[in-house]
């Protein structure tokens, strides 16, 4: 046990979500949870099931935190196990108690089972009591479970493991049988275990097989081996079609072949081989688990047929620990010295002499059985299941290490290389994966002879860069991972002199894998293998600097590897050409688009620096090849994308250090013209090439060293104008960046092309049939120099928002882009220019703040409002304006932002808060804002406004009734009438609290009502705001305060009632008419002598005669509710309202009912 396990008394010992040290609080809590068990199960057959479940879940959660590093718990596990064992009462120990397992015992076994899962059964079972007297109670307990219907399989597994460790004791079994016959006890134990072999597959089967195998391995159990094996083999032959029974039999056979003495089984090996031969070759249809068991069976048959010996011919390195190697007197150097070379040659000669002696081994016994085992284990190396291949690889190593001479081992390795690498690997990744695992296992055991390295190393080099492009990509990942493991094993196995001829090749392949592999676990595997190689082999060039740069943790981030780590590594002359070749041949043409992009960036970063052994001509040749390949007609779109992207990045990287591209000017200029026919708008390959062209033009323009003729500029501009109006957002975004670079490089002084752009922009803004075209033209305006934007173009931008047409009413994204363009133009313009366009700009932005366009995606107008708020804050804070302009627009802009800070969309509220905060923080704009201290306190943290309940923070501003009152009321009303439940509740509650506070204060209440009436009148044409007001009207009319008895004395109330009537009468929307009925129902609470009451009652009675059944029913319900709560009510009217079917189609019945109600109520 680890007595010095690291303890973390803080909460900082965490890497990711895994602990790096034991948190002592976790240990204390685990112990406390175990101590709680007797309290929870205080009664014999009763317990608090909820408390027991909560206790167990917390215990399991704490334990599983250490699942990846269970050794951290070793210091405390013995105490925990002892405490749990004390709580277990086995049947038969106390004869006074009933023959049944108590709930406390079962729960304790369940806790022990979790410990087994986390730390491993072999570790935990050693800590269980081994006393001989426990045998009978364990047997009685397991026999009780045979008849039990409980589904506690984990607890039974713990009992079986406990029985196994007790059976291992070398005691005389006759003590436990009255007749003194040990066979009776063994039979009893085996019968108990055999019961669990019939279950469906779970861990109990393996434990039961272990118990049986150890019974047979005992001296008094050996006579039973023959008969038991005979029955087992007969059962396998009988049940080979039944997967459940076959699996159980194979697990039992495996346990017997492993644990029973080889000398006992040797005599029966021929029978076993003969009886099981019908199961081979392995049928993959039987399932992965059975196939794995069959592989294990055949390898153990082979192991029994061979003598267990340490082969004299196996390779023995000697020192395996790094401490011993570090004590070596040889000094590390990048190039081996002359003396090292001499020693290496002498070592090689010695090894050859040893090989001559190795042939003098014994002859192979049971050759037919061994050949049979090796043949099927080697076949299993190409099985489709990973677990089967892994088991087969271990089997190859175990069998080969027992072969009597090295010629046989050489044949095994030759078979692996010829059958699993080369052409066959191109069609199946399983072959390469299994072969790499097998080579690693052979190297571990020292049976992969140095003379075979010449054949092995090329195969491993190919496997380290293997890609299964046409299949499932994870298969290729497995091969590369296994290849890293194999190289790691080779590094640990061989002397530096043996590995010296191949060392640099393998180190270079590992370095490329550590830097450029797609998967993080494979980059880490390659890094670990490289570190092992540098540590154990002393001839890796620049080894120490390499493993410091390509560290296990440093390679975690792929972007960092491609953009940063590869550059200093490429500066080492040994690896410069290798890294470039790997990027060019493997990564630029990779199947993953993201890898191709990152490889191109790596080429740019590396080409920016001068490398010692890489000439500029080499780069030019690469560029020439890429440009030609990207223009070929019959080429994959993926390859075209990779080549063209790499060309662009190479151009940019090389021009940064002054390379001349005048010789390539024509080829580069013709790229867009040649590739445009491949830019189909309707296909994915076409979209890919469009994205690539955008990036290529951006990179070439950013280099600023590639000169274009006027004709070429015009063609490139035409291509960009097509790309920037693409319907796909990602292509427009890339084209926008490309246009920005293209304009800065080629159009700054070209009046003709700028005029061409202006004409296209004005035409698109004036008359356009596609939203994406207008978005694209807005992006171009954003990219142009502000001096190039004349007033005509600026006015055309503004008019798209100020004077929308029916065809572009839904184009919210186009208006958003227009606002972006206005923002950029205004910020970049001179003071003189802004004084000319400022008023028009803010008029447009205010109009944009009223954009509530909705679509299937919801409120898309919010994008326009958010862009407008950012534009207003940016322009005002930039302070290119005169004080009168600020005085006029700062407060007005702030009002709109206050309104948006109360609306229902969380991100819009956050944006409004951020914009207001910038206005408040700025000294120039802040002095124009009233109540700045209050604003600063409310809008201090934009992230807070994401929460729905943040609306309550606006109450001080609402109570103030200041300049922001009208916009704040509008924002709250829009939220209260929205569909989002969270903001709807909070906004309604805020408005209700405010109304109740002021309803007895006539001036303030009049101000509130007049504000609502004015906003309601103005918003009735905007569906969203009008609907919100209709939603909130019942609440307003239900709390009229001082106007409740005589509401007509308030002009604002009358105005809202009239507006509501107009909407209800003219609207064809059923929802609005139902909301008007709810509002009228609230008005019935007014004084009965008031005009408003009579008007509301009349309208409700008229609605009872409506043609719409839904409206009739709604009106009847509202009238019934009012009459039930009224001080005076007519029972006959209530009975008529309740009993009449208002959704009936019989007009006469309904008319009579309405006439009777009207006669009673109207006076």
From Swiss-Prot:
Q: Give start-end ranges for the coiled-coil region(s).
A: none
Top-rank taxon, per record: Eukaryota
The molecular function terms in GO held by this entry are:
beta-tubulin binding; GTPase activator activity
Report the gene knockout effect: RNAi-mediated knockdown results in reduced microtubule growth rate.
Q: Which InterPro entries match?
A: ARM-like (IPR011989), ARM-type_fold (IPR016024), TBCD (IPR033162), Tubulin_specific_chaperoneD_C (IPR022577)
Cross-referenced Pfam families: ARM_TBCD, TFCD_C
Q: Which UniProt keywords apply?
A: Chaperone, Microtubule
Q: Would you name any one GO CC term?
A: microtubule
Do you know which Gene3D superfamilies this protein is assigned to? Leucine-rich Repeat Variant
Give me any GO biological process, just one.
Answer: post-chaperonin tubulin folding pathway
User: What exactly does this protein do?
Assistant: Tubulin-folding protein; involved in the first step of the tubulin folding pathway. Plays a role in microtubule polymerization.
Family recorded in the similarity comment: Belongs to the TBCD family.
Query: What is this protein's name?
Result: Tubulin-specific chaperone D
What is the scientific name of the source organism?
Answer: Caenorhabditis elegans
